[in-house]
Amino acid sequence: MNTEKLETLLGFYKQYKALSEYIDKKYKLSLNDLAVLDLTMKHCKDEKVLMQSFLKTAMDELDLSRTKLLVSIRRLIEKERLSKVRSSKDERKIYIYLNDDDISKFNALFEDVEQFLNI
């Protein structure tokens, strides 16, 4: 690998690390949380989605373990960036969704990230 490619790789790493530290300090979130939040925006914006179905999709698309996904989902719910509701017919079923407040927080967060990264 030549020096130019190594410098490019180092630049990506520094940007990744800086973003990770920034969102941790400002929002108390991880990059996994951002990835899960982005995926929920794609799949749960218009309707409530069964948690089990979402976990299967997220495991495939994000290549994260079930445990890491559940940690991120729980953190996002605690930070009020994602909403959940239990089924009235079967209490074992949990649905996740984004309400209007969650969507506005999502947009503000990702606009802030774009500004931070200058993209």
Swiss-Prot record:
Keyword set includes Transcription regulation: yes
Protein task: Involved in the regulation of virulence genes. Acts as a repressor of the agr locus and consequently targets genes regulated by the agr system such as sspA, hla and hlb. Binds directly to the agr promoter region.
Location of the DNA-binding region in this protein: 55-78
Keyword Transcription regulation: yes
InterPro entries in alphabetical order: SarA/Rot_dom (IPR010166), Transc_reg_Sar_Rot_HTH (IPR055166), WH-like_DNA-bd_sf (IPR036388), WH_DNA-bd_sf (IPR036390)
Cellular component aspect of the GO annotation: cytoplasm
Localization annotation: Cytoplasm
Organism of derivation: Staphylococcus aureus (strain bovine RF122 / ET3-1)
Keywords for the protein's UniProt record, in alphabetical order: Cytoplasm, DNA-binding, Repressor, Transcription, Transcription regulation, Virulence
Lineage per the UniProt record: Bacteria, Bacillati, Bacillota, Bacilli, Bacillales
Pfam families: Staph_reg_Sar_Rot
Family: Belongs to the SarA family.
One biological process term in Gene Ontology: regulation of DNA-templated transcription
A GO molecular-function descriptor: DNA binding
Protein name according to UniProt: HTH-type transcriptional regulator SarX
